[in-house]
Amino acid sequence: DAERADVVTTAWAGSGFATLFWWDLDMNAERIRFGDWRLPCGSNRASLSGLVHGITAYDTATINPAVDREIASFVVPVIVSFADPFRIAFDRGPGADDRIGSFVSGLHPGYVDIAYDGPVSCLQIDLTPIGARLFFRRPMTEFATRLVPLDDFHDHGLKELSAKLGDAATRSERLRIAVAFLERRLLGQAIDPKAAFVWSAIRRSRGTVRIDRLTEDLGWSRKRMAAHARDAFGMTPKRLARVARFQHAIDLAQSAQRPDWAGIAAACNYSDQAHLVRDFNAFAGETPARWSFRTQLQRAKQNDNTGQGAPG
């Protein structure tokens, strides 16, 4: 597959569960990345591109207790864990009752805090929303803002996958098993063309497309559009567009050494900087300035862990 990157082995901690999952950890990982989000319709697919963001196998022998934060994204993670449970909570700090092992989590228009109390060993499949709908063949409203244990699905394929991954001797072997499973499960399935149209329009416009225009193009009412989007993605088109615009702001901020928040707000079609701040508080749980400060610290830790720190 020409769109698949080489598998790399690093002491790495980037872009895991979503934007910031693993950055505070000294983690060994191997990852396969797939192509971008563009979706050719139809069932004659030879690639997982557009259905799977990537697959990562993580391992660490020891870990100091830590809490990391995931901000709103378009990743639907499937986690198969081989070690201690995580503690995970939406829009708050996780408590003792928030433990979970292997799970799937749908889209969430907010942030998620993840706590680790012991060693981490897992395989993570990052599905796109379109890929997740095909993978589970169930309405994505069943997963939105939820952590669903994999055992709850009573899915023979998932149980077999978990067993094979658990028996695998290396991270590379786990990746090969996961790719083969995804190809069997996803390739050959027809993508819902109307869901793909809505998804592509929102992503291509970075959240600025008028939802009324989409309903007109499809010949639907607003009510029908909202119902179809909730089934396909787990949230309404308007909410999807807000997250897409927020993600565009994140991309611009990450590409700048010192983000110009007023300029970013204008470039992302926010009404003003206060509007941008409101979305950051909703989707990241903190102000843009606080988010920027925290991510800079995390990048510095990552560079220290990989030996890529600035020369002193």
Please give the residue ranges for each predicted region.
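DNA major-groove recognition helix of helix-turn-helix
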Residues: 229, 241, 280, 292
